[in-house]
Each structure stands twice: as C-alpha cells, then as structure tokens.
C-alpha cells in the first residue's frame, strides 16, 4: 500500500513531469492557450502513458535489452495512432485545435522516460498506475497554465469545451470579464513561459513551507515533555 501511495504522490507532485522534471515543455507551452486544449492534450497523454506502461511492463520479459528502445517507440507509436484516431472520430474540433501535437506524443520524453525507468522494471498494475499518475500530474499542470492564460488573455474559462466534451459542454463556458481585445501576451508563447515560471516558483514555495512544517513537527516530537524549545 505504501508503494502505491508513493507512486501516486511522486507522479502528481514530488516528481511532476512538468514542474519538476521539466519534460514535454514543447506541447506544454504551445497548446495551453486555453483550458480546453490543455485538458484535451493532457488526457490524451495520460491515456497513452497508462496504456504504453501497461503494455511494455507486460512484455518486459520478452523484450531483448539490445533493441528495447525501438520496441518501446513502436509500442508508443501504435498507442498514439489509436488515440489520435479516437480523437479524430469523437472530438474533431479538439483534433483540429491540437493538430500536430497529438502525433508528437510519440517523441515526448515523458512517455519514453517512464517506459525505460519504470515500466521495464515493475509489474503491469503498478506500471499502469505510474503512467496514470505521471499523466495526471502533467494534465493538472497543463490545465492550471491553460486556465490562467485563458482567463488573463480572453477573460473566459472553458471556452470551446464542447469540442472536448460534446455539445452539452457549452454551458461550462464562463465569462469572467468582458474584453473587446484579448491580452495577446498571455495567449502567445512569452505568456506561457511567464506562467510556467510563476507555477515553478509557486511549487517551490509550497514545498519549502511543507518542509519547514515537517522539520518543526519533528523537532517538537524530539523535545522532552513539558519543554517548548524556547531559550
């Protein structure tokens, strides 16, 4: 149980692929102009990570070490092609918005990295959980960045959600403030870099605060009864 918890915590926070490892920055910065696009690519990446980790882990005993990387890439490419066709069939608007970044999941360092570092060494169930956790960690980072850029740039949230979730999702669109002209800095790549930098700084501050609290808690437990630690 502790191993399962550790895999989840590592994927979502401690070893977050976007905010700690800084992998997959090309799609992270290019696609996150809206919350819908960010969520769509994030979920697609999560599905690919889960399925590829599961497949590679299942076949790990029959995969020759000398040619394992080409085999991993072939498996990843097959899964990405299937996911791309699913998005094309059931969410064509999102497919058009994401464009080339769906097939580029094949070359995403996150996917290949987890296949080599985790799935090739662990069992199928734990590998699938690792892929899901890493994918959801990246999805959360994409969604937060996409939401911030959309709100600051257009004053809306979930604009175009129907492209991802269907026509019923039009009701999810929220107009936070009205603007006649979008704030282009937030919508263009410089805004993505600035937003990512702020998110990295925020995560660092949260980690430092949590570390300080843990240190104080350990120090309090180490003191004899009745002492407060004050000089």
UniProtKB/Swiss-Prot annotation:
Its EC number is 7.-.-.-. It comes from the Bacteria. Keywords: Cell inner membrane, Cell membrane, Electron transport, Membrane, Translocase, Transmembrane, Transmembrane helix, Transport. The keyword Transmembrane applies. It is found in: Cell inner membrane. The chain crosses the membrane at residues 18-38, 39-59, 63-83, 86-106, 125-145, 182-202. The keyword Membrane applies. GO terms for biological process: electron transport chain. It is a multi-pass membrane protein. Belongs to the NqrDE/RnfAE family. Part of a membrane-bound complex that couples electron transfer with translocation of ions across the membrane. Required to maintain the reduced state of SoxR. The complex is composed of six subunits: RsxA, RsxB, RsxC, RsxD, RsxE and RsxG. This is Ion-translocating oxidoreductase complex subunit E.
